[in-house]
Amino acid sequence: ELARRNSDPSYEKWRVNNRNVYEYFGNTNWYDVFYKDYTTGHQHNISVTGGGDVASYYVSGRMFEQDGIYNAGDEKYQQFNVKAKGIVNVKPWLRVENTTDFMSRYSHQPTSHTGISTTPMTVSRMLNHQAYPVAMVTNPDGTWTEAAVYTGWAGFVEGNSWRKDRKFDVNNRTAVTIDLLKDVLVAAADVSFYFNQTDRRQAVNSYTYYTGPDSSGERPSGSLYEERSYNRQKVASSATLTYTPRLGDNHSLSIMGGWNIEDYTYKSNLMSREGIIIPGKPNFSLLEGEAMTLKDNGSYDWGLVGAFYRVSYSYKGKYLLEASGRYDGNSKFPSNQRWGFFPSGSVGWRISEANFMKNANWLDNLKIRASVGSAGNGLISDAYAYLSTMSIAQSSLLNNGSVFNYTQAPSPIPKSLTWEKATTYDLGLDFEAFNGRLNFSADIYRKKTTDMYVVGEELPAVFGNSAPKGNYADMRTDGWEASLSWRDSHKVAGKTLSYNIKVAVWDNTSKITRYTAKTGTLPTNYSINYYEGMTLGEMWGYKCDGLFQSDEEAQTWANYSKFTNRSATWQAGDPRYLDLNGDGYVNNGNNTIYDHGDLVKIGNTTPRYSYSIQGGVRWNGIGISMMWQGVGKRDWYPAKESGYFWGQYGRPYSMALPWHN
């Protein structure tokens, strides 16, 4: 019937069945419905520069605008940038400079929603699940079909479900450099300010569809208007003093010390209300919902302060020594765990400067080096994780006819909350020859990350709260990297032809060496669960032994009830998973490293043997460059919603794929 109606234009692509419901016989390409073949954009740039020995300046501006890729919905993006930089040499020993960046962005994006929520669904997912080719966009009377509403196309066309963002960024840095003793003692200081303001407006409207001449539905089941504002500020300052004494031709010494301070502020407010009266003009005065949500959607302040130093020494450019360190404090940690010291050191020997290499004129540089260095990471998401906080909620019960507020259970405080510390041990080799044309560099390293910020031991259910994050794990990363490059130039037709090529290869693996939580829960596609001894990126799954050849074989195989939905039965053509532990069931046990049933490691998602190739050629003002990047090995398993990969088998087998859960 479908083929007959599509081959003969005299037949309608729809009919009303005996239940008074539309039946469709379309051949709709929903990608053509939604997407343009191309989109357009334009940008304009302007810059002005000038000055002399005493003062110089640079000012640039950019305007960029691009239309969206959808055939409806008026998607648009606009951006304006202005950058200004000025330098003034007030005195031969005093230099002042200032840099200001301003950026303004505006975006209008049509959205699709399955419920009264400002979290939109992605178009690709809605097309995957709701865009049936046999379905039509509109009914014969011009009303929307269910597919048109469920995919979001109706909202795109009517243009009243959208998200509009307007963002402003201002970044200013002022720096002063004072040459106290010319080329010997130099002081420098700077102060910077960053401000970001984001205003977001969102409208969610409902759309009516008809499944028959007299039957209709609505999606979403209501409407909502929301306004959010985000405000971010950062003030930072630093100062350094560098001492470089003159010690003769054989010795070179540099000593630098300084401090820095950073202060961050974040504020977010939200206001929303349901019941849009006029879909094209959402406004809080034109909403009929009874409840209006007004709340502080997250506000915090936090800061960093630190002191640092670096001492570098070189003897005849042959033996190289360097020591450095930082002492940092972070307001996100409790007072007794707030500070951390992170030292580093390195040594190097330029073999090419040794006496026995003096006659190797082809060799420019040959250096071996070793280093050990530590760095602290204090960028945890919660600025007040060291405080036990209690949320305030509103009871659903009445007290004298009114609802009342109550406090929820206080949040637990982790035993240890301090800096993550990453210590890297590195051995390296640098080689340069033939007047800098040939270069080779290689490193092998081990990085030990201690006090990782992760979820701690699972708490008993009677505790009434989830386990807090803290410093509960350590990790070891082993890796190497190498690069080889060649560059040269020749005369071609009286003009210089220059070319270059560079190949780089690198690899690393990471393993959890300590984890205080002993639950041993296996990782999945949607959550990273650590256990001691785990290699990062592990994928666990069932071992497959082909497909069932008959229904009888499927029914007499191991028990599949662990991942059988409703009354479904396994039959010929379904995958045949192995019962590896011989208990008669194919399942994941307790889904832990101690009891994983028939699960085995089937791969690893970590990219391995990554590589890049860069090259370029330039002649007579004409140039071409290229860059290739790749991964030598990586295991990948698509998620259960990857409909473009799984097709109609995406959800039927999702219960049988533990990596999905």
Regions found by a protein language model. Give the residues of each.
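Residues embedded in well-ordered regular secondary structure
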Residues: 1-73, 113, 176-177, 556-574
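Conserved small-residue
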Residues: 1-21, 270, 489-605, 645, ...
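Acidic, glycine-rich flexible loop segments
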Residues: 2-29, 43-45, 116-155
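Extracytoplasmic gating/loop element in the C-terminal half of outer-membrane beta-barrel translocons
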Residues: 5-7, 21, 155, 289, ...
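Extracellular/periplasmic, surface-exposed regions of secreted and cell-surface proteins
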Residues: 42, 85-104, 112-113, 124, ...
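Predominantly transmembrane beta-strands of Gram-negative outer membrane beta-barrel pores used
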Residues: 43-69, 83-89, 97, 175, ...
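Glycine-rich, aromatic-lined ligand/substrate-binding cores of catalytic
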Residues: 604-637
